[in-house]
Amino acid sequence: MAVRSLWACRLRVQRLLAWSAAWESKGWPLPFSTATQRTAGEDCRSEDPPDELGPPLAERALRVKAVKLEKEVQDLTVRYQRAVADCENIRRRTQRCVEDAKIFGIQSFCKDLVEVADILEKTTECISEESEPEDQKLTLEKVFRGLLLLEAKLKSVFAKHGLEKLTPIGDKYDPHEHELICHVPAGVGVQPGTVALVRQDGYKLHGRTIRLARVEVAVESQRRL
């Protein structure tokens, strides 16, 4: 049995040697030879350079991206600075307009009042301490006409600028428009709780009360204060 096994091993060795000789005769390296291992090693090393070239390529890509981002940041910074400057200019113009509105907001009203002042000045010129007694009647007539003209002009100016006079006789008492001075007994035809007498007219500007009318309000006799 041992002889048979030895003979089989010898046969296999002979076949392997014959196969190796035939492989080398054709110039092919043996699969397990040193040359084959060296060639395989070189092939493996030949794949290493891309790994060595990898970092520089990635670094260049990052640099390009960084430059691009830096330009974008600079562009955004310039835009932001311009926007801030525009906002500041708008704020200054708005503030200037508000200040001008405060100063010149009543310019038109004052211009119309100047005409009233002219009428008043001409009316006072009609009065003279040295006027003769026979001229006093004529002077009073001129003053009266001047005062009527002055009143008409004032009403026209007030209406033009939305200023409305409040004379609320007979109206129901409203604390938002009337200032109560006292209560008076309700007379004939006068309803309790209504304005019986106006001591001082009130005024509204474009529907907003700027001065309350000073009034006396009617009440029933037993509730008189």
From Swiss-Prot:
It holds the Pfam family GrpE. Transmembrane segments: none annotated. InterPro entries: GrpE, GrpE_coiled_coil, GrpE_head. One of its GO terms (biological process) is protein folding. PROSITE patterns: GRPE. It comes from the Eukaryota. One of its GO terms (molecular function) is unfolded protein binding. It is found in: Mitochondrion matrix. Keywords: Acetylation, Chaperone, Mitochondrion, Transit peptide. The modification N6-acetyllysine is found at residue 142. Essential component of the PAM complex, a complex required for the translocation of transit peptide-containing proteins from the inner membrane into the mitochondrial matrix in an ATP-dependent manner. Seems to control the nucleotide-dependent binding of mitochondrial HSP70 to substrate proteins. Stimulates ATPase activity of mt-HSP70. May also serve to modulate the interconversion of oligomeric (inactive) and monomeric (active) forms of mt-HSP70. HAMAP family: GrpE. Belongs to the GrpE family. Probable component of the PAM complex at least composed of a mitochondrial HSP70 protein, GRPEL1 or GRPEL2, TIMM44, TIMM16/PAM16 and TIMM14/DNAJC19. This is GrpE protein homolog 2, mitochondrial. The gene is GRPEL2.
